[in-house]
Every structure is written in structure tokens, then in C-alpha cells.
From Swiss-Prot:
It is found in: Secreted. Expressed by the venom gland. The keyword Membrane does not apply. InterPro entries: Conotoxin_a-typ. This is Alpha-conotoxin LvIC. It comes from the Eukaryota. Keywords: Acetylcholine receptor inhibiting toxin, Amidation, Disulfide bond, Neurotoxin, Postsynaptic neurotoxin, Secreted, Toxin.
Length: 38
């Protein structure tokens, strides 16, 4: 993964990690970062 996403923009890396985790739990966002997670 590129470590960046549209939702996170250029936020701190910890924020990006949280955003990706939240994205995993979000069915609308799921798949962008969490392919195969669900």
C-alpha cells in the first residue's frame, strides 16, 4: 500500500492508521485498504 489515501490526505501517520482501521470497519470504504479483510 502507498501509505496515503484520499480520506487521510497528508495527516500524521497515526491518523492515517486510524483512518485505515476505521475504513476497514466501514462497509462503504472497505475494500480500498482492506481487500480480503472482510
Amino acid at each position: 500500500s502507498n501509505g496515503r489515501n484520499a480520506a487521510a490526505g497528508d495527516k500524521p501517520s497515526y491518523w492515517i492508521t486510524l483512518a485505515i482501521t476505521d475504513c476497514c470497519a466501514n462497509p462503504v470504504c472497505n475494500g480500498k485498504h482492506c481487500q480480503g479483510r472482510r
